[in-house]
């Protein structure tokens, strides 16, 4: 423990005229009152108020605040009384110690209403004397540093309260270093596995880049010295919680983070800040969109600094913060360092927050809410809306508060309420109006989720959400839906396979064959067959070892191609496939004599081409809605490709052949456009007709079909269709995927 003279010396370093008598008297009084009391760790209880006092000396606070820290637990935990403290230390210190005692008692209960009342009293106390906040935050910081000795449930409750209230409150009041440490300690107990993983990765990265950081630090210092700027440069690394939060909110992996390292440049004057900025930007390239000037436009908590990001050595992104030394002190200690309580306070109370400054407008507005008699729980939730600048808080129709990262959508909201609600979400009302599911939510929005039992979350939702929980749930639901589809497909294939083999079939019959197939359960077998990973003949043989499959694929034995129940089209690339007429169930026919439909009379709807050059589409086809590019073919005109076509890689080194073209479509457009679809379907009677019927039902023209591969269970085909536009094509592919006969369907590009 810190000795009495050591405490006095710590304060004397920044305040030579310290009132030693006050510190000595508070030290001795608190030590005697706490006596032989022990903390949960077994340490003397007096070590706690002493450590709280030490934290405040690091913030260069006056002796009265240090004395309050030493005394802050005496009324609650010892025989000390308010009257006694008033007599020994004065009524001002006695009032603050008693106020902190009342707040301390409320900390022991986790009910939301009590927590809300705690926050109300804390904010009201801060408005009267900012030292309440300083001692309270230092008290919470030391408790968090020693939280490991507590029961797990109590650790979690205190850590969550710290993350929810105290860390953002410290940030709001400009005390960034304390906010970061509170967040890191809370993160360690709320999600220990993630904390450990991120911490280990950061340590590895720091060791790997130590030399690079030293080089940049040296280069910066030399540049400033040569140009007559007195500056100190210090490298810094993002904290684990900051890294984890960015990974979660932006859906990034650790490897995708590009600004883990940064540098803080401290100079003497504001003019030097801008001179240093100019030197940095003339030495290294800056990253567009990453410059922020908080000197000319300070943050609400009076934070001032210039932020910029450069491309440093090894092409790494490096963030730099440029500020004066006074700005750095305010950024580190916030209200504790700010002149707001040193020389801007009222004459009666130099520690009262001034109502004239703009530095704490948020706190003044919040205190005004208190006088309006808000319900305590409502006040807690509304205050949280303001505490978390990087989060949005929305409400269910019943008033439940849901916290989400900025950029969250109604889909994130639905999954935050419950996974089942997310899985069944088909729409949302935001503040009573039906809004698109991609709508970005704002603070205070009321969100009502519209549900359907038949809904299955589409995979495309993954790109719309901002939370890891929603993303993981969508992936899980998508996998489950796909697995269910493949299982149904596998069931149909196996029913036919066992029927051909003359063997009875049921799910239970498959169980004895699981070890031979190296599958964990029957559903796994069905899905594997449906995906085409496991041939149906192997399953029959696993159940009936004596079974012999006499069939061969049409690839190896073309003579079998005409066998009943199987289909294959020889030289199909030269044939024209006609969509059947006559409605549902009509048969599909192949007409070798048919010809490709003639193009429409209107010229190709492409702008940006030379009218004297012939224009054609690439074999894989581009349709309206695609981004397109033209490639000049010497002696053959211009070929139009969809921008995603792999064939374009052949022209990467020939930029002179690329032509900027675009669609020129009007409502009277009557032409169809060619596109190519790859389909894998069950090799059974009726499958081809079902595929053709889907095309016909969607007003698409199939003008060519070729078999890419035929196997006992599946056949893979390439279908050339003519469609109106990209939406038309996507609708056809979507319905093909939903067909019970189709294993997969996708567009072919190139």
From Swiss-Prot:
**Record domain HD: where:** 45-144
Give start and end of each TGS domain: 390-451
UniProt entry tagged with the keyword Zinc: no
Per its UniProt record, what PROSITE patterns does this chain match?
ACT (PS51671), HD (PS51831), TGS (PS51880)
Start and end of every ACT domain? Answer: 676-750
User: Catalyzes what?
Assistant: GTP + ATP = guanosine 3'-diphosphate 5'-triphosphate + AMP
UniProt keyword ATP-binding present: yes
The family database entries (Pfam families) matched by this protein are listed as: ACT_4, HD_4, RelA_AH_RIS, RelA_SpoT, TGS
Q: What happens when the gene is disrupted?
A: Cells show morphological abnormalities such as branching and swelling forms. It does not grow in RPMI-1640 with or without 10% FBS. It shows decreased growth until 48 hours in RPMI-1640 and stationary growth until 48 hours in RPMI-1640 with 10% FBS. It has the same ability as the wild-type to internalize at 0 minute but a lower rate of internalization at 30 minutes. It shows a lower rate of intracellular replication within macrophages than the wild-type. Its adherence is four times higher than that of the wild-type.
Tell me the segments the record calls region Disordered.
587-613
Known InterPro entries for this protein? ACT-like_dom_sf, ACT_dom, Beta-grasp_dom_sf, HD/PDEase_dom, HD_domain, NT_sf, RelA/Spo_fam, RelA/SpoT_AH_RIS
Q: What is its EC number?
A: 2.7.6.5
**Molecular function via GO:** ATP binding; GTP binding; GTP diphosphokinase activity; guanosine-3',5'-bis(diphosphate) 3'-diphosphatase activity; kinase activity
CDD domains documented for this protein: ACT_RelA-SpoT (cd04876), HDc (cd00077), NT_Rel-Spo_like (cd05399), TGS_RSH (cd01668)
**Entry function:** Functions as a (p)ppGpp synthase. In eubacteria ppGpp (guanosine 3'-diphosphate 5'-diphosphate) is a mediator of the stringent response that coordinates a variety of cellular activities in response to changes in nutritional abundance. Plays a role in adaptation of Brucella to its intracellular host environment.
Similarity section: Belongs to the RelA/SpoT family.
Its name, as the record gives it, is GTP pyrophosphokinase rsh
The record lists the organism as Brucella abortus biovar 1 (strain 9-941)
Q: Please name the gene that encodes this protein.
A: rsh
């Amino acid at each position: 423990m810190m000795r009495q003279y050591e405490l006095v010396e710590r304060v004397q370093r920044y305040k030579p005229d310290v009132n030693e008598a006050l510190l000595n008297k508070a030290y001795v009084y608190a030590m005697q009152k706490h006596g032989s009391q022990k903390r949960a760790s077994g340490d003397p209880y007096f070590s706690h108020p002493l450590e709280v006092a030490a934290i405040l000396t690091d913030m260069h606070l006056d002796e009265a605040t240090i004395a309050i820290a030493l005394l802050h637990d005496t009324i609650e935990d010892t025989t000390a009384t308010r009257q006694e403290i008033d007599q020994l230390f004065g009524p001002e210190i006695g009032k603050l110690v008693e106020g902190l005692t009342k707040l301390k008692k409320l900390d022991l209960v986790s009910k939301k209403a009590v927590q809300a009342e705690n926050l109300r009293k804390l904010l009201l106390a801060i408005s009267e004397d900012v030292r309440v906040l300083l001692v309270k935050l230092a008290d919470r910081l030391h408790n968090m540093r020693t939280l490991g000795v507590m029961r797990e449930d109590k650790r979690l409750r205190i850590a969550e309260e710290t993350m929810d209230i105290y860390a953002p409150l410290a940030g709001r009041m400009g005390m960034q270093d304390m906010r970061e440490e509170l967040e890191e300690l809370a993160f360690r107990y709320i999600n220990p596995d993630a904390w450990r993983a991120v911490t280990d990765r950061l340590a590895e990265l720091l060791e790997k880049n130590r030399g690079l950081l030293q080089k940049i630090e040296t280069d910066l210092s030399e540049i400033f010295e040569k140009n007559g700027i007195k500056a100190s440069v210090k490298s810094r690394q993002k904290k684990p919680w900051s890294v984890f939060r960015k990974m979660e909110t932006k859906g990034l992996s650790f490897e995708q983070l590009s600004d883990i390292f940064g540098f803080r440049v401290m100079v003497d004057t504001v003019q030097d800040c801008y001179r240093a900025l100019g030197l940095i930007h003339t030495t290294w390239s800056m990253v567009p969109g990453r410059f922020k000037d908080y000197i000319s436009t300070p943050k609400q908590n009076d934070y001032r600094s210039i932020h910029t990001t450069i491309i440093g050595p090894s092409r790494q992104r490096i963030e730099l913060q440029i500020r004066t030394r006074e700005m750095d002190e305010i950024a580190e200690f916030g209200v504790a360092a700010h002149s707001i309580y040193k020389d801007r306070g009222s004459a009666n109370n130099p520690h009262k927050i001034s109502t004239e400054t703009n530095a704490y407008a948020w706190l003044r507005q919040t205190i005004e809410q208190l006088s309006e008699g808000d319900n305590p729980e409502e006040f807690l939730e509304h205050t949280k809306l303001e505490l978390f600048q990087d989060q949005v808080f929305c409400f269910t129709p019943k008033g439940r508060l849901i916290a989400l990262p900025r950029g969250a959508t109604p889909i994130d909201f639905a999954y935050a309420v419950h996974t089942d609600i997310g899985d069944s979400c088909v729409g949302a009302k935001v503040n009573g109006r039906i809004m698109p599911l991609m709508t970005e939510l704002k603070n205070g929005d009321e969100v009502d989720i519209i549900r359907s039992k038949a809904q299955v979350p589409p995979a495309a939702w993954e790109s719309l959400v901002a939370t890891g929980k929603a993303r993981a749930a969508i992936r899980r639901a998508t996998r489950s839906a796909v697995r269910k589809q493949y299982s149904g497909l596998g069931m149909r294939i196996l029913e036919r396979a066992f029927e051909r083999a003359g063997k009875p079939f049921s799910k239970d019959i498959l169980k004895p064959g699981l070890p031979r197939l190296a599958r964990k359960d029957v559903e796994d077998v069905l899905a594997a067959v449906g995906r085409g990973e496991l041939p149906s003949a192997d399953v029959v043989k696993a159940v009936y070892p004596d079974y012999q499959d006499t069939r061969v694929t049409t690839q190896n034995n073309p003579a079998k191609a005409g066998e009943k129940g199987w289909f294959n089209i020889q030289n199909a690339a030269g044939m024209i496939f006609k969509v059947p007429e006559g409605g549902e169930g009509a048969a599909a026919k192949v007409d070798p004599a048919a010809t490709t439909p003639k193009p429409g009379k209107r010229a190709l709807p492409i702008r940006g081409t030379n009218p004297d050059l012939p224009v054609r589409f690439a074999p894989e086809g581009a349709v309206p809605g695609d981004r397109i590019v033209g490639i000049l073919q010497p002696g053959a005109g211009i070929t139009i490709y969809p921008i995603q076509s792999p064939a374009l890689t052949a022209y990467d080194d020939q930029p002179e052949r690329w032509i900027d073209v675009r669609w020129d479509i009007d409502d009277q457009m009557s032409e169809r456009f060619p596109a190519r679809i790859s389909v894998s379907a069950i090799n059974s009677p009726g499958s081809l007709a079902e595929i053709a019927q889907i095309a016909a039902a969607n007003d698409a023209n199939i003008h060519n079909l070729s078999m890419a591969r035929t196997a006992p269970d599946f056949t893979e085909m390439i279908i050339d269709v003519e469609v109106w536009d990209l939406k038309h094509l996507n609708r056809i592919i979507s319905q093909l995927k939903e067909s019970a006969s189709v294993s997969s369907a996708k567009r072919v590009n190139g």
